[in-house]
C-alpha cells in the first residue's frame, strides 16, 4: 500500500459500457470508433509506450490523418463534456519518445502504475461513481486497494 488512507467504495453504483478500450494496431482508423455513450477512453500503447501520431494528411490542410491518435484526441476534445483519453501502460519517461510526448502534451493522461485489466476496471468504477475530468484523473491516480503494482 502507498501509506495513504484507504478509500472505501460504500456507495451503490452500476457498471455500464461507458469506457471504450482501444488496443492499437498497424493501420488503425479512429473514424471507425463511435463515441456515443463513451465517458472515457483507455488506449493501449505499442512497446516502450510509443504510438502512431503522424499528424497531417498534408502540410497545407493541417487536418489529422484518421490513423493518428491526434485525430482521436481532437474528437474527444470536441465532445460535450470532453472525453478523457487515458494511455496505458505508459512509462513515466514516455515524454522522451517523440510520438508519445506529442499526444501527452496534447492532454492525454498517462497511466503506468496498474495492469491493463485493472486500469480498465478502475475507469469503469470511476465513471460509474460519476467522476469526470479532473475528478476522474485524481481517482485513477489514487491507490484504493493495492492496485498499483508498478512503482519507481
Where would I find each of the regions flagged by the language model?
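Accessory alpha-helical/coil subdomains and C-terminal extensions
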Residues: 1-55, 62, 148-152
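C-terminal non-catalytic interaction/assembly regions of soluble proteins
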Residues: 48-152
Amino acid at each position: 500500500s502507498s501509506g495513504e488512507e484507504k478509500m472505501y467504495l460504500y456507495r451503490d453504483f452500476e457498471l455500464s459500457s461507458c469506457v471504450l478500450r482501444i488496443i492499437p494496431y498497424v493501420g488503425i482508423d479512429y473514424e471507425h470508433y463511435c463515441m456515443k455513450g463513451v465517458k472515457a477512453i483507455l488506449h493501449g500503447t505499442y512497446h516502450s509506450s510509443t504510438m502512431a501520431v503522424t499528424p497531417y494528411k498534408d502540410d497545407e490542410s493541417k487536418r489529422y490523418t484518421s490513423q493518428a491518435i491526434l485525430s482521436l484526441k481532437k474528437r474527444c476534445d470536441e465532445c460535450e463534456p470532453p472525453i478523457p483519453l487515458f494511455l496505458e501502460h505508459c512509462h513515466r519517461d514516455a515524454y522522451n519518445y517523440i510520438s508519445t510526448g506529442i499526444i501527452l502534451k496534447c492532454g492525454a493522461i498517462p497511466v503506468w502504475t496498474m495492469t491493463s485489466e485493472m486500469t480498465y476496471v478502475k475507469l469503469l468504477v470511476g465513471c460509474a461513481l460519476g467522476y469526470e475530468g479532473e475528478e476522474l484523473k485524481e481517482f485513477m491516480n489514487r491507490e484504493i486497494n493495492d492496485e498499483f503494482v508498478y512503482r519507481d
